[in-house]
Amino acid sequence: MLFSINKLRDLANLDKQITNDQIIDAINKIGFEVESVKNFLNVSKIKFGLIKKVYKNPNASNLNVCEIEFEDKMRIIQTTAQNVEQNKYIVAFVENSTFGKIKIEAKEIKGTFSQGMLCSLEELGFDKSLIRDEFQDKIFLLDKADLKQDPIDFFDLDDQIVDVSILSNRSDANGYFIMALELSAFFETKTNFEIKNEIFKIHPNLKVDETNTLDFVLIEPQKELKKISLKDQILIMKSNIKTFNDLVDLTNLNLIMNAMPTHVYDKDKISNEISVKKVSQEVSILGNKKISLDNNLVVCSKEKPISIAGVIGIADFGSDQNTKNFVFEIGRFKTLDIQKSIKSVKLDTQSSKLSSKKISSGTFKMALNFLTSYFDSQVLVSKNLKDKKESFNFVWEDLNKFLNTDVKKMPHFNRVLKSLNILGFEFKDNKVYLPTYRHDIEHVQDILEEFLRFYGYENLVFEAPNIKNFETKNYEEYLNFIPYLNYSETRTYSLVSKDKNIFNPFNFKENINLETFHSKEREQIRNSMILSMEEVLQYNLKRKVENVNIFEIGIINNSQRSLALLSNQKSFNRFKEDVESILKDKLYSFEKGGFDFSHPLESIIIKDNDQLIGYIIRANAKDFEEDFVYAEILIDKLRNKKIENKSLNYLPLKTLDINFEVPSENGLFEVYKTLEKNEKIYSYKLIDHYQKNQISIYTIRIWAFEENIEELKTLFNL
């Protein structure tokens, strides 16, 4: 939705000391989102003038010479516009005025000196396609103006247009009045408008069938329409809506001021019997575009469709400059009916967008009052609207459990209460009474959201919870997580033969023998799961399953719980990364080391407090028939990392590349251990390696915050 900052400022009665930037910031803080801000002003130093005399340039019949009185002096200005009249007021560019990047200067034209240029609306910065036809390619004339007043101030040209994204449940805020009320609540001001609750005379002859509607009212004025001022036309154009005539412009004013779609009909073309029904036929909508209706909701005069409900009018019944008698219609309809019609018409307008959203009874009532104000409330209506405030049980203590504090003792409570009262909320008798324009408030949580919008999320004081770390023997975390790494769970026997129980990587002191057993194949509890996992691999390979990634949580030795992983598909480093992902919340360190049955170059042991708790290896070809990488971890011995709450640092990370000279590959693990223990280091990565004689040189890139980089340079003697 496009809003004029000047109009919002005026309606919300905001002091000039409140800057545009503060208003924009307030819109964001109270739950809306400013998508863009555009400066509207494209001119400077223009003036009001009074045409005292008009005559033709003797050397050019298409040029009119105008003698014009300005606040500072008389000037002669020539123009090709043929609608200039004596005793009419105009707006003009005079010497040193600017139009975009063009500076206006006095100059001779066809033998007559011209001291400026008369303004059209297009030259003031308005889109030509939005200007009324009567002003197209013409100078706009005024019946009255104050020569001392600056036209830029009078027409609100020194303005900013903000494009605000409105939440779908806040359709009411698509209008100036409610957005201004929101700003008034934020800045604690009294608005320059009043939400009234008027009662009108009922039309004696109108018969309205409201079936298929949520609310529907016809309004027939009994007094002449107040002229839509040029200032109001400019406001409509600032919303990127075309101006047509006073009747249509009034409906568009109601749209932007109250977010209420409104239609106007030529009264002489419709009957007094109006109904809302679903119709299937071909019609010609405004703009003479023909469409086929397929059970679409329409407003009918007797049996003739006069508009597609909430979307657009039918061409034959619209108003124009010649319309003398007219009827306005405002209605609320089911959103599904409107959305279906939008698809049929294939026309996406501001009116159809708002009709497709839920509209409250309060918005409906405000729109009716605004519309009738242009006739001094001298109207006949098909019915009057009920305006009852909804309520539900509520006490402020209801919010305490959500905020973990006594709400009434919060430092800004009274200020927020005042803001909510400005919005129309009433808190009394253990109830909250809701503004009638709000349809989105239903629960205590909604009141909490309203409270926090004006309290300010940035003003909340958060207290970190007291987290007590504990160890758990629940293995579900592994069973749920590991499959996401592309491993399938398998099940194997814990019992093996004595001949096969030859691998003891954890150095168990004794084998666990069964006193009774069914066969020699199942007489001991295994000391490692590696042979069992290889058997599963071989089983799958025989069945042409070539890529095998498996895991199991099983028993080894004296009821030790072991996590085993095997892959014949992944590289050693990729497999190691999987293990790191599984152990991300555990205390451990990697060290160079291995066993007789592991590959000499691809083998790592896992320790915690110098105790062996696991290993990662590639199987040695002399001991195993298949090629695979394997990991085994005593998960009952894993300890959880201590959870610490730290403030988030939003500054960018810096990098530092350091060369480490180590005599052997095992020395690299010592470097890693040193880096892991340093709390100043955010992360690190090996990026290069080369051999120099008997020395290995590793280049490691370190990421850290800027304030820690210098300390790290000192630590590593850089």
Curated annotation (Swiss-Prot):
Quaternary structure annotation from Swiss-Prot or TrEMBL: Tetramer of two alpha and two beta subunits.
Catalytic activity: tRNA(Phe) + L-phenylalanine + ATP = L-phenylalanyl-tRNA(Phe) + AMP + diphosphate + H(+)
Origin organism lineage: Bacteria, Bacillati, Mycoplasmatota, Mycoplasmoidales, Metamycoplasmataceae
Co-factor(s): Mg(2+)
Binding annotation for Mg(2+): D440, D446, E449, E450
Cofactor note (record): Binds 2 magnesium ions per tetramer.
Disulfide bonds: none
PROSITE patterns assigned: B5, TRBD
Compartments (UniProt record): Cytoplasm
Gene3D superfamilies in the cross-refs: 3.30.56.10, Bira Bifunctional Protein, Domain 2 (3.30.930.10), Nucleic acid-binding proteins (2.40.50.140), Phenylalanyl-trna Synthetase, Chain B, domain 3 (3.50.40.10)
Protein name, entry field: Phenylalanine--tRNA ligase beta subunit
Organism: Mycoplasmopsis pulmonis (strain UAB CTIP)
